[in-house]
C-alpha cells in the first residue's frame, strides 16, 4: 500500500511541476455563439494561482460565462507556465483584463492598467508555511541551514510574506536558509511532502484544495506558521478597453455569488465573491513591499 501511495504521489508531483517545462500554454477561448467577425476577443490573463492545467479547469467556466452574457465579446483565458512568463506579458500589456497578485497589481498601475476589482476573502490572502509532521521542526530557528520551497520570487502571499515572517522571527532569509523556487503552488507543497524541502511556503487556497482532493498527502503535513493577511488578488483592465465592456464585466463578476451558476464557479476558486476595488485598496500592499525591500531582499 505504501509503495502505491508513493507512485501516486510521484505522478501528482510530476503533473504539479509541469509549469516549468516547455509546454504550450493553456489559452482556450469560449463563445456561446461561435466565432463571429463582429465579436471582439478580450484576453484575460490569470496569474499562476495554480499550474496551467489546473488554472484552465478552474477559470474556463468563467470565461464561457462572460462570453455568453456580454454581446459582441468573447473572452480568452491565458495561463502562463510560471510567474516570470506572466509578468512579462502583463507588463507588456498583452492582457485586456487580468487577475494579478497584489504585487503585480501594484506594478501594473505603472504599466497603464486600471484597478477595478479584486477577489474577496482578504483573510485568506496570507502566507502559510507547511512542514511534515514527522520533521521534528519546532521553531523558526530550526529552519537554519534547511531548504525551503516557494512557487516563485514574485509570489506575494506564497513567497514574500513567508520570507518576511521568517526574517522578522530571527532567521536571515538570504544567508541562513536555502531558498528553492519551484514554479507552482502545487510543486512547493509536493517538495516538502517528498522531503525535497524541509518546509514549503504557499497560501491557503492551494492547501485547502489539496486537503480536499488528496487527503492522503495532506495528512502527512501541517501548517506550522502563518502570516498576517493583505488585500487579495486584484482585477485590472487595460485603458483602451471600452468603459461599457468594463462595466458589464464588473457587474457580472461582482454578482456571481448571488446565482447558483456563479456560486459553482466561485466554489472551484475557493472564493466567496469578487468585489469592487481601486488604487487605494492596495496602499497596505505598497507599504509591505517597501518594508520587504529594505529588510529581506530588493525587488526588481
Short names for language-model regions:
Residues 87-142:
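Acidic, polar ligand-binding/catalytic clefts
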Residues 84-98, 111, 141, 185-205:
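Short helices/loops that flank or line small-molecule/ion binding pockets
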Residues 18-45, 50-57, 61, 230-232, ...:
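An extracytoplasmic/periplasmic, membrane-proximal ligand-sensing/linker region
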Residues 13-16:
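C-terminal motif of bacterial Sec signal peptides marking the signal peptidase cleavage site
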Residues 131-146, 240, 247, 255:
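Hinge/capping helix and adjacent helix->loop/strand transition within the periplasmic-binding protein
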Residues 26-102:
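Extracytoplasmic small-molecule ligand-binding "clamshell" domains
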Residues 2-8:
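Sec-dependent signal peptide recognition
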Residues 135, 146-244:
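Pocket-lining segment of extracytoplasmic ligand-binding domains
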Amino acid at each position: 500500500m505504501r509503495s502505491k501511495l508513493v507512485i501516486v504521489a510521484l505522478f501528482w508531483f510530476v503533473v504539479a511541476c509541469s509549469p516549468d517545462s516547455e509546454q504550450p500554454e493553456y489559452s482556450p477561448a469560449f463563445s456561446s455563439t461561435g466565432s463571429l467577425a463582429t465579436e471582439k476577443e478580450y484576453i484575460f490573463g490569470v496569474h499562476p494561482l495554480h499550474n496551467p492545467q489546473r488554472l484552465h479547469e478552474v477559470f474556463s467556466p468563467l470565461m464561457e460565462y462572460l462570453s455568453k452574457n456580454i454581446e459582441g465579446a468573447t473572452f480568452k483565458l491565458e495561463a502562463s507556465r510560471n510567474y516570470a512568463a506572466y509578468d512579462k506579458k502583463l507588463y507588456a500589456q498583452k492582457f485586456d483584463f487580468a487577475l494579478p497578485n497584489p504585487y503585480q497589481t501594484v506594478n501594473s498601475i505603472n504599466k497603464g492598467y486600471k484597478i477595478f476589482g479584486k477577489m474577496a476573502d482578504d483573510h485568506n490572502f496570507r502566507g502559510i508555511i507547511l512542514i511534515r509532521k514527522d520533521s521534528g521542526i519546532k521553531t523558526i530557528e530550526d529552519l537554519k541551514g534547511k531548504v525551503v520551497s516557494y512557487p516563485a520570487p514574485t509570489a506575494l502571499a506564497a513567497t514574500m510574506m513567508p520570507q518576511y515572517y521568517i526574517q522578522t522571527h530571527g532567521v536571515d532569509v538570504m544567508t541562513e536558509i536555502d531558498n528553492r523556487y519551484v514554479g507552482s503552488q502545487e510543486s512547493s507543497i509536493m517538495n516538502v511532502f517528498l522531503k525535497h524541502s524541509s518546509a514549503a511556503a504557499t497560501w491557503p487556497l492551494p492547501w485547502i484544495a489539496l486537503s480536499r482532493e488528496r487527503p492522503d498527502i495532506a495528512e502527512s503535513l501541517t501548517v506550522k506558521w502563518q502570516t498576517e493577511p493583505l488585500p487579495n488578488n486584484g482585477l485590472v483592465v487595460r485603458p483602451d478597453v471600452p468603459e461599457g465592456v468594463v462595466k458589464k464585466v464588473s457587474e457580472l463578476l461582482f454578482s456571481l455569488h448571488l446565482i447558483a451558476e456563479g456560486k459553482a464557479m466561485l466554489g472551484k476558486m475557493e472564493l466567496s465573491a469578487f468585489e469592487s476595488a481601486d488604487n487605494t485598496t492596495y496602499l497596505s500592499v505598497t507599504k509591505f513591499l517597501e518594508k520587504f525591500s529594505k529588510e529581506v531582499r530588493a525587488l526588481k
